[in-house]
């Protein structure tokens, strides 16, 4: 089973502001390199069109609900 807080971080990565994503990551006490890498990933994802981000989220939901994950 996937940690619900981890799922919240992933949701924040795709849907929230950079500061909200940083706060969500903070629960896991990342070191500076991890925080910087997360911020870079957020910047890259924010450049994707909304349709692409929505499709990625739908794919992750489909994977999570598939028989291969249950």
From Swiss-Prot:
One of its GO terms (cellular component) is extracellular space. Club cells (nonciliated cells of the surface epithelium of the pulmonary airways). Its main location: secreted. GO terms for molecular function: phospholipase A2 inhibitor activity. Gene3D superfamilies: Secretoglobin. InterPro entries: Secretoglobin, Secretoglobin_1C-like, Secretoglobin_sf, Uteroglobin. It is found in: Secreted. PROSITE patterns: SCGB. GO terms for biological process: signal transduction. The keyword Disulfide bond applies. Keywords: Disulfide bond, Phospholipase A2 inhibitor, Secreted. CDD domains: Secretoglobin (cd00633). Belongs to the secretoglobin family. Antiparallel homodimer; disulfide-linked. Interaction with LMBR1L is controversial. Binds phosphatidylcholine, phosphatidylinositol, polychlorinated biphenyls (PCB) and weakly progesterone, potent inhibitor of phospholipase A2. This is Uteroglobin. It comes from Macaca fuscata fuscata (Japanese macaque).
